Amino acid sequence: MENPQDIFSSNGGCLSDIVIEKYLVESKESVSHVQLACSMQDCAFPLDGTELCIWNTKDPSHQLLILRGHHQPITAMAFGNKVNPLLICSASLDYVIMWNLDECREKVLQGLVPRGTVMGSLLGKVLCLQLSLDDHVVAVCAGNKIFMLDIETQAVRAELQGHLGPVTAVEFCPWRAGTLISASEDRGFKVWDHCTGSLIYSSSVLSAYPLLSLFIDAESRQLVTGCADGQLWIFSLMDGHHYRRVARVDLRKKTETFSTRRVKSGLCSQPEESQLPSTSALGKGEQVEVTFPVLRLAPCDLSLIPNSACGCLSSENTRCVWIGSSVGLFVFNLANLEVEAALYYKDFQSLSILLAGSCALRNRTADQKVLCLLASLFGGKIAVLEINPAALVRAQQCPSMGQSLSVPASSCVLPTSPLYLGIAKEKSTKAASEQRRAARNVMKDQRLVFHSKVRSSGYASAPHVTMFSPKTNIKSEGKGSSRSRSSCAREAYPVECAVPTKPGPQVAAAPTCTRVCCIQYSGDGQWLACGLANHLLLVFDASLTGTPAVFSGHDGAVNAVCWSQDRRWLLSAARDGTLRMWSARGAELALLLGKDMFSKPIQSAQFYYIDAFILLSSGPEFQLLRYHIDTCKDEIKRYKQKSKSKLICRLSTTGAVDMTSLSAVNDFYSHIVLAAGRNRTVEVFDLNAGCSAAVIAEAHSRPVHQICQNKGSSFTTQQPQAYNLFLTTAIGDGMRLWDLRTLRCERHFEGHPTRGYPCGIAFSPCGRFAACGAEDRHAYVYEMGSSTFSHRLAGHTDTVTGVAFNPSAPQLATATLDGKLQLFLAE
């Protein structure tokens, strides 16, 4: 965890700009577990147990409006959703009272005692209140029951029973009239139809700790509930999703990751003119293990903040939620499941409350400030804070290092670039090699004795008469021309096509149960290459029909395959430490790089820069190789390999940790190479500059085993900025979507189980979908705008290890641990 003085960067200015304590009062009785309430300009809290106090933030005299009517300590209160009239409901063991604040203020000005309307009496200990969106109904949570009270008639519309423990939170669904969601100390939530009083859905037990808070996000149609141990549970409320779980988040771990990234970035420093907090809130030498109970959840829309304040936050990634905890306030992003900002009470000497027992939050749209009402965990202090979210985010968001980075090449190759040197050297030697080749051709044209059968000297014999010359090119021409015509006539990839979910052909890649390590389509979508654990490389027709072409020669599992951009060559790397380039047409070996050339086995290998280079990773470094394939066939010296490669440059990761994945674009010119390391980082290399350009620390909770870039295809086009998106995945940590321009995670996908085996991921050619394998014998398809999966593809017989989208048609190929290949087609 960072030191308090390191929490805020020099961009934030004075700490007093972030949070101001506007009001402080001390009650004779503790209100640490009382439901507090905030409206746009009013804060409500109990004073001395039975008095309901309303403090108006716009009143310069700080006059309290005190409402009396309860004889027992107030346990809960809630504001209405309408401004005129502004209602507030309060509850105690004796009464549930509804107050009209406008009428109460008028009576106070007239010197009269304000009175409320008793909604109910002796309902029990009320822990939570919530008014409906139209202020017609109030939900009163007393014990394990929920009473739906009509505000106009004070009648009980319905009594909801089913929880096994006290109900701690309740929310009305904004888009479903009559739907109510409740959370309880029984560690589950329930969905009700409060109009009929019926139960719609009941969750299982989520945690070992009680649920304390609820929040419904209308835009993403998600439910967020918080536990006493700092766990956040997120569920989908979309129709047809059946309240499935989207993610589970540990708030403590997320805050630690947030702090670690800032420390490793090295961009955050101490502000020069800030009043720094003390390093210990409880005294010198004392250390207390505090939990992060989620006391309250409230909406936080960072889109209202000026872009200059948000820094590298994208406009699509500003829907967040405020988390009120005992130690501080946190801005949590529902898209990428990350903490965007953290405000610890102990970091501000001006704050009177360092540990909170209850809190309430409300956004003010007029000035984009946030009202926070806190009650001390120990004692009777109650404080009103005014928070500036723009200053908070600006102080903690480090300047983006990726703003100048772009996957599509945006500048010419520099003379000092390894790319320039590799191409320039090739061009300089091209003329000489052509001259030597021409000389060899001239020599080959001379009549030699051993080129034909000879009976004596051979030169005096008459030449043989050609009796019959078969047209051996008929078959190849027909097949090739048909293939080329079909390739040229293929339609563009349908951008608005449906997800390929219809099961198609399924074949076994090998006679025995053999793991499929990797799969990749050719650029024209006609062929599918598969690397197997039995040392073979197979090439299937895209329809998985016919007999596959077999490429044999490796002595280990083939863990990487790659097609060249012109589809003439295939690259394969295996556990035996060798790299082989094959002729895709004849299944012949064209280039062999032995294990003696690499310090460690090759982890990743691919063509790069439109087939100009080979890019591979071995140990802590990746190598850029220039290659030459000799296509001339010499029957005499066919045993001698004339194809060759040359090392242009090698670059190592920061810290010299072994690489686990490597990715670069080959279909168009790009200077960017992405590498993942065993230290859970993703490093960006700029080969135009020949160095590391940026490092993403703590990219996942475990090492990334695959990076997948949005490369599109030659059959469809995307916006140029879309090519800056890439996916990463790690065992047990789902899949993350990143933007190279901001070096930020834009979305986190967690709906598929991958707890022990590295499963593959893939981008669709249109860039709208991402697919991934899973251990539950299913493949999952996500839409880029949603954190939960849109389709779950069944029909597999084992763990789905690899997925690949056809670049020319809406097809998805999957590979399994037992060696099966499965096609999915669009409906």
Curated annotation (Swiss-Prot):
One of its GO terms (cellular component) is nucleoplasm. It comes from the Eukaryota. Keywords: Repeat, WD repeat. WD repeats lie at residues 3-57, 62-101, 112-151, 155-194, 201-237, 292-337, 344-387, 502-542, 546-584, 590-629, 646-687, 698-740, 746-784, 788-826. SMART domains: WD40. It holds the Pfam family WD40. InterPro entries: Quinoprotein_ADH-like_sf, WD40/YVTN_repeat-like_dom_sf, WD40_rpt, WDR27. Coiled coil: none annotated. This is WD repeat-containing protein 27.
